[in-house]
Regions:
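Conserved class I S-adenosyl-L-methionine
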Residues: 1-52, 86
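A short SAM/SAH-binding and catalytic strip from SAM-dependent methyltransferases
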Residues: 115-129
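Class I SAM-dependent methyltransferase SAM/SAH-binding core
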Residues: 55-57, 62-106
Length: 263
């Protein structure tokens, strides 16, 4: 269940959900999925330049899942993270990678300073009417903005059924959210950017309790009452063990990648 929430910018609910990760930073770092090497290959292909040596700012870096991958590719990467708990977890896990505090709506970066601006699982927390102009300000001529999200592969039956269960339990329309997240025009309602889209499928096998901890690190669960969250995760555990009796869950993701060059 990795679909981004509706970007109700300025709403109390949106702000509460955005802040909810700080208290669960260790859980997030331990159980959230990473990204496949093929995704970074696609970033290089669509931007037309190697990551090695590029000046990259990874915004909404969280605990550093994507930042570490960019660093390993040889990018000169700087993490930008607004949350206290997430930033503390990042610094604990990646002491050799620089981090500054800030967010995409007001980047703490100089004009024309960055070859590549990345948002892994984080663009939907920004207000694109502010974050698009900020991206264009800090990108160098010829630079690019890359956005990506792990999204559940909903054509796989057990994943589709899990989404339906979550929708029924919480009264949310998950399929509508997935359709909304796939609309590239919502990434930039200002119309200043021209995105190229690519999808990369990948999977991982993890213990059922790790899968449940991954689900539990999503904002819609972090902000709900503890008794309701516990009841939902217990129900999910029972259902998952019917599909995966050995207790090992195969998660499958379609990474949605959007890349736009600076006009």
């Amino acid at each position: 269940m990795t679909t981004p929430p509706s970007p109700a910018q300025g709403s109390a609910d949106h702000a509460t959900r955005a802040r909810s990760f700080d208290a669960a930073a260790a859980q997030y770092a331990a159980h959230r999925p990473s990204y496949p090497a093929a995704l970074l290959d696609a970033v290089e292909d669509l931007t037309g330049r190697p990551l090695a040596g590029a000046r990259v700012a990874d915004v909404g870096a969280g605990t550093g899942i994507s930042t570490a991958l960019l660093h390993a590719r040889g990018a000169r990467v700087l993490a930008v993270e607004p949350g206290d708990g997430m930033a503390a977890q990042f610094r604990s896990s990646h002491p050799g990678i620089p981090l500054v505090r800030g967010n995409g709506n007001a980047l703490p970066l100089a004009d024309d300073s960055t070859d590549l601006l990345t948002y892994a699982q984080s663009w939907h927390w920004t207000d694109p009417h502010r974050s698009v102009p900020e991206a264009l300000r800090v990108l160098r001529p010829g630079g690019a903005l890359a956005l990506w999200w792990n999204r559940d592969a909903s054509d796989i039956e057990w994943i589709a059924e899990a989404s339906r269960r979550a929708g029924r339990f919480f009264g949310i329309d998950i399929p509508a959210g997935k359709q909304r997240a796939a609309r590239t025009e919502l990434a930039d309602p200002t119309g200043r950017l021209r995105f190229t889209r690519r999808e990369v499928r990948w999977s991982r096998r993890i213990p059922v309790d790790s899968h449940l901890a991954n689900i539990g690190s999503h904002s819609f669960l972090l902000v709900c009452p503890e008794d309701r969250r516990t009841a939902f995760l217990a129900q999910e555990r029972d259902q998952l063990l019917k599909v995966f009796p050995d207790g090992i869950v195969e998660e499958t993701y379609d990474v949605l990648l959007l890349v736009a060059g600076k006009p």
